Design a protein with these regions (language model features):
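Short hydrophobic/aromatic beta-strand micro-patches
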Residues: 13, 70-74, 108
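A generic structural signal for short beta-strands and their flanking turns/coil linkers
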Residues: 8, 40, 49, 65-69, ...
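N-terminal beta-strand motif that seeds the catalytic metal site of vicinal oxygen chelate
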Residues: 1-18, 69, 123-124
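Core segments of cupin and vicinal oxygen chelate
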Residues: 13-51
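Mid-chain, well-packed structural core segment of small domains
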Residues: 70-83, 90
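Vicinal oxygen chelate
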Residues: 3, 82-83, 87-124
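A short beta-turn/loop motif at secondary-structure boundaries
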Residues: 36, 60-61, 97-100
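Short beta-strand micro-motifs in enzyme catalytic cores
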Residues: 40-42, 67, 101-105
Length: 124
């Protein structure tokens, strides 16, 4: 058995690295911790989680996938966050809906990658 201590990072494909960095920084204040000079990729950080943004020119996201990144948000901030998504004309594909005793909203980044804001945390 291979023993995994934790997830190191999550990687997503983007068609325009600079646009994606701006999206994640402006909307969520994610910190850019590394931007490769010899490749079109960068790592952003939220809490203890790293997300790798990997540019592939001409990338077209496959629609209909359930792949997503779920981001925990405090209950008292949820409605304001949904308002901010709407104010920024960000495409909402699901919700906001009641889910697991809380709420969830799923929306798209500029490349159609699905992101979810939700509460409460999953109990595992």
């Amino acid at each position: 058995m291979i023993v995994i201590e934790s997830i190191d990072h999550i990687g997503i494909t983007v068609s325009n690295l600079d646009r994606s960095i701006e999206f994640y920084r402006e909307l969520f204040d994610f910190e850019v911790v590394e931007k490769m000079s010899n490749a079109r990729e960068a790592f952003i950080k939220v809490g203890e989680v790293m997300i790798g943004l990997f540019e592939i020119e001409g990338y077209a996201n496959q629609q209909g996938s359930k792949n997503h990144i779920s981001l925990f948000i405090d209950e008292e901030d949820f409605d304001d966050a949904v308002d901010e998504l709407r104010e920024n004309d960000i495409t909402i594909v699901f919700g906001p809906e009641n889910l697991r005793g809380g709420k969830s909203v799923v929306f798209l980044d500029p490349d159609g990658n699905q992101l979810e804001l939700c509460y409460p945390r999953m109990n595992i």
